[in-house]
């Protein structure tokens, strides 16, 4: 027999609890159980959901899991894996949709908020350029490169070529520290100074360089490097 949500005692069923008390009342594994719908012959869907989260050490790693990684778990086939991935992607798109309508960056906090959820859990360093118009509205965002930050790799040409193409008035550069600690390195500072100087020469201001950690960030402009 395959365990389904209806086989769970009624007062413990995630769907019924969501209807009665709202989604915020459910735990992570209960929400996941609703997506999975069925368990296995040996465990309920709630138990399966708990095991999936334990496998990925919670939502943080589940967020970036692949179909192959999910289907390696007993009880998770391609259909369940696709359901989970679709829900995760919808969540990402909903989060981003709030910022796509000409998001305005007035201060470092605005810039960090714009990218924090996308960048704080990345396992590699991503260097991103955010292009703004004269009203400080975001007109484009581009990942310039992925990998350890190095002055020989981050060429200003790659950053400002897109700025010219988009007729941007200014640029904010952002990169993440996978360690979660946004403290700038010597390379971070050198890259920032080089980009700021090139921006002054061509007339497209580097407004800031933000380093993203885990729910925290550092503005190199506030530190005096821009």
Swiss-Prot record:
PROSITE patterns: MPN (PS50249), UPF0758 (PS01302). Zn(2+) binds at residues 175, 177, 188. Keywords: Hydrolase, Metal-binding, Metalloprotease, Protease, Zinc. The keyword Membrane does not apply. GO terms for biological process: proteolysis. CDD domains: MPN_DUF2466 (cd08071). Residues 104-226 form the MPN domain. This is UPF0758 protein GTNG_2548. It comes from Geobacillus thermodenitrificans (strain NG80-2).
């Amino acid at each position: 027999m395959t365990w389904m949500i209806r086989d769970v005692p009624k007062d413990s069923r995630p769907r019924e609890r969501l209807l009665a008390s709202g989604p915020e009342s459910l735990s992570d594994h209960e929400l996941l159980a609703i997506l999975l719908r069925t368990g296995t012959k040996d465990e309920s869907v709630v138990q399966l959901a708990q095991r999936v989260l334990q496998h990925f050490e919670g939502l943080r790693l589940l967020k970036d899991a692949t179909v192959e990684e999910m289907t390696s778990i007993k009880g998770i086939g391609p259909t369940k894996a696709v359901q989970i991935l679709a829900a995760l992607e919808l969540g990402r798109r909903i989060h981003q949709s709030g910022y796509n309508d000409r998001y305005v960056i007035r201060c470092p906090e605005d810039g960090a908020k714009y990218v924090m959820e996308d960048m704080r859990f990345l396992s590699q360093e991503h260097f991103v350029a955010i292009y703004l118009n004269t009203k400080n509205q975001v007109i484009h965002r581009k990942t310039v490169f992925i990998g350890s930050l190095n002055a020989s790799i981050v060429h200003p040409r790659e950053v400002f070529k897109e700025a010219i193409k988009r007729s941007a008035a200014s640029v904010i550069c952002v990169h993440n520290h996978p360690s979660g600690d946004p403290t700038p390195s010597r390379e971070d500072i050198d890259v920032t100074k080089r980009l700021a100087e090139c921006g002054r020469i061509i007339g497209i201001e580097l407004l800031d360089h933000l380093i993203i950690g885990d729910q925290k960030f550092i503005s190199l402009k506030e530190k005096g490097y821009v």
